[in-house]
Amino acid sequence: MAFAKKEKRLKHMQYISTRGTAPVLSFEEAMLTGLARDGGLYLPETVPQLSKDEIGAMAGLSYEEIAFRVMQPFLGNAFSEDEFKQIIGKAYAGFQHAAKAPLVQLDSNHFLLELFHGPTLAFKDFAMQLIGQLFQLSLQRRGERVTIVGATSGDTGSAAIEAFRGLAGVDVFILYPHGRVSDVQRRQMSTPSEGNVHAIAVDGDFDDCQARVKDMFNDFEFRDSVRLAGVNSINWARVLAQAVYYFSSA
């Protein structure tokens, strides 16, 4: 992984597998693919740099504006600036605090970053709500449909189901360990009535759920037949979205 020159940050973003043998993909392709075919994770080939002045200029901006400035350099030409701004606006419209991730001062030396103002009260809403909108626009433009499969111990599953419920072009199946998530999380996953989201209780623990998901991704014939995608932390788009609040709180 190298560091990109500023003038190249928007045009030549490519994503490579950590294991080095999977095809090189664009941001959009890497996002829709999830786990690389060689078993690695997709990461940017080059890392765009933000200067001190650019970071300093974020002071006082809204969370949405900061999100745009932090993430846009990693997208290449996947979305126009206007498209991405609209995506960000839709993603965070349902948060219950104007600041989205307010930094609260407790005393002279202690601050608390509140990450519970999303629709499921989990910090993972910050990434899932954005990924849902990114997936929907990408799939609509491509005329494609994907099947998202994930494993959860609670908060990932509820955040994913909330983000993708009712969206076109996506079916979501979340595996969770039976009797090992909180009642609130179970209800968040199992009560949405939209036909494209499904919560599946597995007799076992989280590792058993994760093993089943990995088996599906490693079965290339099955993976291709249902166009499998993932939104667990294997997906770079999720990691990128969750980096924004470090800038907003700085």
Predicted regions and their residues:
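PLP-dependent amino-acid enzyme catalytic core
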Residues: 2-250
